[in-house]
């Protein structure tokens, strides 16, 4: 893939003007950062900087679009109703990271009855799902942390960058409570990740999160289907390695075995797996529009988070105004 030269940084004063009190969501619990919600109509300069930072972050991991900025029609066209959750460092006056999201009861559909959204390129959604949980779901996509905040370079700001983003998700849960009940997202695994490590990780996800004893979600694995599925191989070998029934004990084995391969479990994957005991994983597909990264689809119910995660991300002293955004 030919890589275009990435655009120049957007002037900080333009960003500060658009990330104003009207767009404020909440303060983070740690590191003194702030979270905002914007779209292209109210913050075109912020969107431009997000596109620049996303492309830098994704290229560094082995993915990316190859364009000068990672922005598409879902970012730029208000008809699709996508918003951006923005994590801002008020000290360095820069964007640390973010998420793109949409309320699924707002999405449009194509002539085949499939939702017009980024994840529909990777997954087929059955009618049963679309008429049920889908309508109470927030789709998350394009999560990123700028590279400088992925190491210890920024001290406490780096240490809490991903945690701060999940403070933002906690803010969304509170903001849309009563209307939305689930997060639908994708866990990205880059091509540089060892093949056997990928296989073991997918096996682990299927073993511990492949079924869900919830009436609405029963047999969800038959409701959301990867279009280019990654098949799990070496099953017999993993049967003899990941032998624990308890998630936490089996997770210790997974972590140790992955580290033997010279890598760690990707941070976002690691965080999602420890977010909810009832998280649903329904397989992984190849994203051929994004550097052939592997994307594992997941669904998380708001009121089934681990209690410590609820306390950590949904309890905060400075409550935002309940605006419709």
List the predicted regions and their residue ranges.
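Short, solvent-exposed loop/turn elements at beta->coil junctions and helix N-caps
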Residues: 69-75, 285-289
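C-terminal non-catalytic accessory extensions
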Residues: 291-325
């Amino acid at each position: 893939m030919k890589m275009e030269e990435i655009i120049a940084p957007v002037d900080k004063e333009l960003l500060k003007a658009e990330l104003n009190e009207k767009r404020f969501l909440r303060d983070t619990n740690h590191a003194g950062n702030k979270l905002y919600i914007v779209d292209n109509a109210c913050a075109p300069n912020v969107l431009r900087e997000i596109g620049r930072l996303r492309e830098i972050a994704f290229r560094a991991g082995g993915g990316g679009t190859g364009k000068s900025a990672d922005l598409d029609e879902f970012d730029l066209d208000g008809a699709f109703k996508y918003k951006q959750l923005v994590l801002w460092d008020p000290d360095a006056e820069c964007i640390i990271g973010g998420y793109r999201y949409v309320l699924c009861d707002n999405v449009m559909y194509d002539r085949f009855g499939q939702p017009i959204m980024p994840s529909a390129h990777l997954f087929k959604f059955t009618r049963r799902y679309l008429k049920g949980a889908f309508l109470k779901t927030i789709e998350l996509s394009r999560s990123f942390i700028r590279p400088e905040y992925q190491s210890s370079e920024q001290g406490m700001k780096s240490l809490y960058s991903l945690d701060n983003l999940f403070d933002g998700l906690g803010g969304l849960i509170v903001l849309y409570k009563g209307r939305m009940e689930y997060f639908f997202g994708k866990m990205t695994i880059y091509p540089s990740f060892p093949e056997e490590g990928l296989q073991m990780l997918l096996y682990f996800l299927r073993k511990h999160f492949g079924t869900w004893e919830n009436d609405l979600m029963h047999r969800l694995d038959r409701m959301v289907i990867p279009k280019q599925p990654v098949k799990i191989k070496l099953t017999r070998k993993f049967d003899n390695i990941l032998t624990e029934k308890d998630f936490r004990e089996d997770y210790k084995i997974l972590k140790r075995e992955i580290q033997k391969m010279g890598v760690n479990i990707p941070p976002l994957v690691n965080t999602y797996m420890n977010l909810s005991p009832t998280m649903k994983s329904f397989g992984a597909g190849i994203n051929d529009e994004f550097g052939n990264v592997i994307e594992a689809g997941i669904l998380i119910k708001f009121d089934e988070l681990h209690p410590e995660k609820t306390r950590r991300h949904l309890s905060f002293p400075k409550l935002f105004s309940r605006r419709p955004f």
